């Protein structure tokens, strides 16, 4: 998502030593401590335009990261957490496309930097309301007699649906 995530916000605070009054690194293994957890929560609430944010709510959000292997609680230390940078890097990986949605792998070779094991394609849904404006202008070019009959047989071929991703049907038809 385009919105800042809590873990990104915490790293942002930790990257500036002037925030040591509320959050600071402890050691070199990704461990950090909230020296003023209420202030960290207040700043997070300010950033997200949520004035009712408090440490209880922020810590609930942090617990969500445990299952995602993004961070863990440091046992025996109050307000201490540890980033799992390997898990964080894994969580940041884009969704991998299913190569079977293409009829031939050679169809993908035109993509710059394409490598079968490093395919980072994410399909973007098409919004019909924005596309309508692309075709709604009636310029003299398209209304000319030669432009009106660009397909002499009047037939347009369509790709076979068998190799298309199943979500395409929700946008067309």
Curated annotation (Swiss-Prot):
Residues annotated as DNA-binding are 1-84
Alphabetical list of InterPro entries matching this protein: Ets_dom, ETS_fam, WH-like_DNA-bd_sf, WH_DNA-bd_sf
Q: Pfam families from the entry?
A: Ets (PF00178)
Q: Where in the cell is it found?
A: Nucleus
Name one molecular function that GO assigns to this entry.
sequence-specific DNA binding
Q: Which UniProt keywords apply?
A: Activator, DNA-binding, Nucleus, Transcription, Transcription regulation
Q: Which domain of life is it from?
A: Eukaryota
Q: Which GO terms describe its biological process?
A: cell differentiation
* Gene Ontology cellular component list: nucleus
The UniProt entry, under SUPFAM superfamilies, shows: Winged helix' DNA-binding domain (SSF46785)
The UniProt entry's sequence similarity note says: Belongs to the ETS family.
The task this protein performs is described as: Acts as a transcriptional activator.
This chain belongs to the protein called Transcriptional regulator ERG homolog
Species whose genome carries this gene: Lytechinus variegatus
